[in-house]
């Protein structure tokens, strides 16, 4: 009965476009365990939302999976410099192969007796297993939006590592801005926030279906949104100006333009930007950061462009991975230790983290 009431309340909030704005509740509800101390294996599934509708939405889902019978090979496939080469999608250096997953970012138990997240270490990750059984439990959900002429698979170096850290990552392929779109137009970005909300409403309905293989493992009261470039614009467009939102957090990578009216989020926001980005200048991201009404952080990568720091092994990747993961752990798992790690996640030369109104 409690679950039915929760879903009803969420659907009311989603249909209305706003709802309770409790960004970092504490303690975590019983349906969600504490932030994981060890990385999960990663599975992947795909489905299409509204396949016969006006705007069909193919969706890729990466999720925490049960361990494989034998340890998987640990490898990040070679980067294909020809993939995702459009100026607002992942550029050549950012076009990571489709299957890399998160490296081990958790240390052995420390002197305190608790395992704590460590620096990412080698930029390698476990192989993604399509159709693998879900790990037990319910997990917070991150909706990830790709950039222009891009695809979810080109962002898997980051999104699969988030899945290994205990998040269900759902990534729609937007109908008119993806790499394979027949009727491509960048102007369609303004319609993508509505597409993203349509997907979230669908996920909430799945969470209400008894025994649904996906819905049974999603904490549908714990959503965040993230995206790169035009996907970052889409993410920002999901936050109505100055209004509470069912989204508990947002991550805007190399983005910040307003595509759906003025956006001044109340929820915690993290911005990631290269200082030498010529496609979406850092000033665009900083202006969006300045408009935030709630807790916000800005990770700047000195001398970097539009997304090379999203490729494993490139300068800044380890810091971006650590910062984004801890930001999600704080906002979706109420992990206070992750909040307190944020100032030290990006202390390498060439990275600077600025924060405003973060809890202490």
Q: At which residue positions do the language-model features occur?
A:
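Alpha/beta-hydrolase-fold serine-hydrolase catalytic core, especially in secreted/extracellular enzymes
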Residues: 26-27, 303, 313-360
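Short alpha-helix in the alpha/beta-hydrolase fold that links the catalytic acid
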Residues: 280-290, 313
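Short beta-strand/loop motif that positions the catalytic acidic residue
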Residues: 265, 271-273, 277
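Short substrate-entry loop that stabilizes the transition state in hydrolases
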Residues: 69, 124-127, 131-181, 278-281
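Short glycine-enriched nucleophile-adjacent loop
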Residues: 204, 232-244
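A conserved short beta-strand
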Residues: 245-255
